From Swiss-Prot:
It holds the Pfam family Ribosomal_L27A. Belongs to the universal ribosomal protein uL15 family. Keywords: Ribonucleoprotein, Ribosomal protein, RNA-binding, rRNA-binding. It comes from Psychromonas ingrahamii (strain DSM 17664 / CCUG 51855 / 37). The gene is rplO. This is Large ribosomal subunit protein uL15. Residues 21-31 have a biased composition (Gly residues). Part of the 50S ribosomal subunit.
Amino acid sequence: MKLNTLSPAAGAKHAAKRVGRGIGSGLGKTAGRGHKGQKSRSGGSIRPGFEGGQMPLKQRLPKFGFTSRKSLVSGEVRLNEIAKVDGDVVTIETLKQAGLLVNTVKFAKVVLSGEISRSVTVQGLRVTKGARAAIEAAGGKIEE
């Protein structure tokens, strides 16, 4: 088998519909669009969510809530991800360098998910009760 001899299995590919190419094709003249009307014209499609002038569902329902600006600069790190970070000290900067947090994050919290077997020192991160217990059980410590 060579790359230049690869081809799809027989019947795996369907030929494209050639519309507007004569009566015999079954898709001649109107090309399967029917007669007249908005959808028969070129560019004649309605936008998603348009309900013919009736107030759309999106606008009939009330607005609610907001996006907290703090959530845009906060991150969450799991215990098993911390185990992948090189070095013994875990800070926001080391997490960003390891690719576990995006650069816009200013605050992060360590949550209990997975396990950690080596001892690490967590600096400047908030830690949940379960994660704190797991880190200390592995011989690590937390510095606020």
